[in-house]
Regions:
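Catalytic and binding regions of secreted/periplasmic enzymes and modules that target cell-wall glycans
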Residues: 166-193
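Substrate-binding/active-site groove segments that recognize
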Residues: 126-147, 161, 166, 190-193
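LysM (lysin motif) carbohydrate-binding repeats in extracellular/periplasmic proteins that recognize
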Residues: 259-287
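Extracellular LysM carbohydrate-binding repeats and other cell-envelope/extracellular binding modules
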Residues: 276-305
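An acidic, Gly/Ser/Thr/Pro-rich helix-cap/linker signature
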Residues: 3-103
Length: 305
């Protein structure tokens, strides 16, 4: 028995030494890492924020916690936030110009980020494009969705549609914060919430979790993207995605049976044609009588790389 106990004791000591040595090795290896290291902390909250020129004070605990939640999520959603900053360099100049022309606050460019991360994505509900329009809403605004064309993917036209829709919501609700909420949940649902709860504004109403978060998500994205370095994001200008503005417009008034052949004739690849014109949804472009389309064609494909 004594032999067994002594053997177990020796084994325990050896295992302890082995474990200690491995721990030291691990700590040493970590300290020598040259990869990204993080300091995880909370995020600073301002006393107030503005959305569309409307002041949102953080003097209520509910508002502070909702804002902090979105700041934390977006500040530490590293890959997505980096891509937001990079893609903004490509798309914001066009979006800002159209917002200004339509008297929509520039802050609403961040709504596009909240909706789609500035990508021509499709939601689980079927909303599409950077501004995430549903097909019925978009068609009602006299924009085209067909087998060959979906203007929800057209940056300029979808942004114009967004401005028309946002201004319509502002005329109805009289507040840009409410506009953001109504854009998310739908104007009919939002108006119903206000009426049923005798609420005068967005901050007094209890809506779905998604809509409770939505304006604060826009605010958080705005806060981080306006001051990325404050949140630890250091993206050199040369690393941002360049605007796709090196093109000429080609007017098309007759059907193109094969867009790949059209692209080749213009000296570009089919892929490049689709990058510059994501609203082209098939390999053909049917042009009805009296219809006209403008295709963006880069001057030289080599210059667009």
């Amino acid at each position: 028995m004594n032999f067994i106990l002594k053997s177990l004791g020796v084994l325990f000591i050896l295992l302890t030494l082995f474990a200690y040595t491995r721990k030291e090795d691990i700590v040493s290896a970590y300290n020598n890492l040259t990869t990204l290291k993080q300091v995880i902390t909370t995020v600073p909250l301002e006393a107030q924020y503005t959305l569309g020129g409307e002041v949102i004070s953080m003097d209520q605990f509910d508002l502070r916690e909702r804002m902090e939640r979105e700041l934390l999520i977006n500040a530490y959603h590293h890959a997505t936030t980096i891509q937001h900053i990079k893609l903004a360099n490509r798309y914001f100049p066009t979006i800002e110009k159209i917002l200004k022309e339509n008297n929509v606050p520039e802050d609403f460019k961040y709504l596009a980020v909240a909706e789609s991360s500035l990508r021509n994505s499709t939601s689980s509900a079927g909303a599409k494009g950077i501004w995430q329009f549903m097909s019925n809403t978009f068609k009602e605004m006299n924009y085209e969705i067909s087998d060959d064309v979906d203007e929800r993917y057209h940056l300029e036209k979808s942004t114009q549609a967004a401005c028309d829709y946002l201004n319509r919501l502002y005329k109805r609700f009289g507040s840009w914060v409410s506009v953001a909420a109504a854009y998310n949940t739908g104007p009919t649902s939002y108006a119903k919430y206000l009426k049923e709860q005798n609420a005068e504004n967005y901050f007094d109403v209890n809506v779905s979790d998604e809509t409770m978060r939505y304006p604060f998500r826009i605010l958080a994205i705005k806060t981080i993207m306006e001051n990325p370095e404050k949140f630890g994001y250091h993206i050199p200008e040369e690393d941002k995605y360049r605007p796709l503005d090196d093109y000429q417009l080609i007017e098309v008034d007759s059907t193109i049976a094969n867009l790949a052949d059209f692209a080749k004739g213009e000296g570009i690849s089919y892929r490049t044609l689709k990058i510059y014109n994501p609203w082209l949804r098939s390999s053909t472009l049917k042009v009805n009588k009296d219809a006209r389309y403008e295709l963006k064609v880069p001057v030289l494909e080599s210059e667009s790389k």
